[in-house]
């Protein structure tokens, strides 16, 4: 493996390690500053909303200006943003920073886009992507544990210290990318465009419009039920994870250190489940349309959420996290496979794009719903919204399965 690929993998690892350090602590920090659950919900919705439009924008800029240059610039913006987040005492500024991060935090996408610039063999590229996923998964698993320990050892200044570390990590990543050798792959040159189209806000709005345009192109009469399954899984997990840390802290009085352990534990289970997806599929040799697997996913998620709801201690809670993580990991893959299976290669790219847009829209709506419930009914009631979503999925997937069998 070349030195350049090793550098790219190191950047991908350090990126998710840094994110894992701080993201689980942000909601608790905002609550400590006096922010309501609605503000906590806004944190997730603002980030997801900007991510919805920024992917095509950053990708287009990287084609125009060069992936290495754009990656360095975005990493430096993220470095400054996280550092300021740790120093500010204003919730409004934190919300603005989340929007800025949603716009510029595209490290994983850009590192994947950089791989073909330094490795031309398609077969080796697939192997590199697999290793990158495993290495990045290790980063997001270690991050919450380390961040939790630091936050617990220094409750007053721990968040500021962690934010500074995260800022340094992103700056270090920018330095690593700088040392990548110059790629021989030519940068695309676009024809000159008007001043209006050079404006970043215009390009962002164009990207958002393109996301909705993709949704408009889909024949919903043919695919609506599968996209509904996708939305139900995304909404259920989005609502649940939006107040995950606060729920553990409020219900079980866990310290940041142990919250980090629980988050890392669930991440490991999800990674292992994704790794063994081929083995899991071997039990469904006659389930050609994925309808049975889809029904089992919603059933597993519903049972898991019920188990979490009635858990009387954190050990029982951790046990029920295992089937929840498995169901979530498999569910993301099953809904995509159902879409591709029904498409018969017709508009496959459009359908994948629409699937991602549905997931992104769920990511925008879910945190706000979670924040609203937490604010007006209590944090312990948030999980009921996730349970309702998965139970609707159980009923729909059961009827879907019956129709397919007939």
Regions picked out by a protein language model, each given a short descriptive name:
Residues 2, 183-228:
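Juxtamembrane intracellular "pre-TM" segments in multi-pass secondary transporters
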Residues 13, 81, 92-106, 231, ...:
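Hydrophobic core of transmembrane alpha-helices in multi-pass small-molecule transporters
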Residues 20, 48-56, 106, 140-141, ...:
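Residue-level signature of mid-helix packing/kink "hotspots" within the transmembrane helices
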Residues 24-38, 242-258:
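Short amphipathic helix-loop junctions that connect adjacent transmembrane helices
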Residues 52-90:
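Conserved MFS/SLC helix-loop-helix module at the cytosolic interface between two early adjacent transmembrane helices
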Residues 55-66, 151, 274-288, 374:
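Helix-to-loop junctions at the C-terminal end of transmembrane segments
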Residues 69-84, 291-307:
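Structural signature of the two symmetry-related core transmembrane helices
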Residues 97-136:
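Cytoplasmic helix-loop-helix junction between adjacent transmembrane helices
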């Amino acid at each position: 493996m070349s030195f350049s690929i090793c550098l790219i993998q190191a950047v991908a690892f350090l990126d998710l390690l840094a994110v894992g350090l701080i993201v689980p602590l942000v909601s608790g920090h905002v609550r400590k500053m006096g922010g309501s659950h609605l503000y906590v919900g806004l944190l997730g919705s603002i980030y997801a909303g900007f991510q919805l439009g920024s992917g095509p924008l950053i990708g287009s800029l990287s084609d125009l200006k060069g992936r290495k240059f754009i990656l360095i610039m975005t990493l430096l913006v993220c470095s400054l943003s996280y550092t300021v987040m740790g120093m500010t005492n204003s919730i409004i500024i934190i919300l603005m920073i989340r929007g800025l991060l949603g716009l510029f935090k595209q490290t994983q996408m850009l590192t994947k886009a950089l791989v073909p610039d330094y490795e031309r063999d398609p077969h080796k590229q697939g192997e590199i992507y697999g290793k990158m996923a495993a290495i990045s998964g290790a980063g997001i698993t270690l991050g919450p544990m380390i961040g939790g320990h630091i936050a617990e050892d220094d409750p007053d200044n721990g968040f500021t210290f962690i934010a500074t570390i995260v800022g340094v990590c992103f700056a270090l990543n920018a330095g690593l990318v700088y040392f990548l050798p110059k790629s021989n792959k030519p940068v695309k040159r676009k024809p000159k465009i008007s001043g209006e189209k050079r404006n970043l806000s215009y390009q962002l709005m164009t990207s958002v419009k393109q996301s909705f345009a993709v949704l408009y192109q889909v024949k919903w009469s043919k695919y609506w039920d599968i996209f509904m399954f996708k939305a139900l899984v995304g909404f259920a997990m989005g609502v649940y994870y939006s107040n995950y840390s606060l729920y553990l802290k409020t219900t079980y009085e866990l310290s940041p250190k142990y919250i980090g352990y629980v988050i890392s534990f669930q991440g490991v289970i999800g990674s292992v489940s994704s790794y063994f997806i081929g083995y899991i599929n071997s039990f469904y040799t006659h389930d050609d349309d994925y309808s049975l697997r889809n029904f089992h996913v919603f059933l597993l998620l519903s049972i898991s959420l019920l188990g979490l709801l009635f858990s009387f201690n954190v050990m029982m809670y951790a046990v029920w996290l295992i089937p929840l993580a498995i169901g979530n990991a498999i569910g993301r893959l099953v809904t995509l496979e159902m879409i591709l299976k029904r498409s018969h290669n017709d508009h496959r790219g459009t359908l994948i794009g629409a699937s991602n847009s549905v997931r992104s829209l769920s990511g925008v709506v879910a945190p706000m719903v979670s924040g609203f419930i937490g604010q007006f009914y209590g944090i312990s009631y948030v999980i009921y919204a996730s349970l309702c979503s998965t139970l609707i999925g159980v009923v729909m997937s059961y009827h879907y399965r019956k129709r397919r069998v007939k």
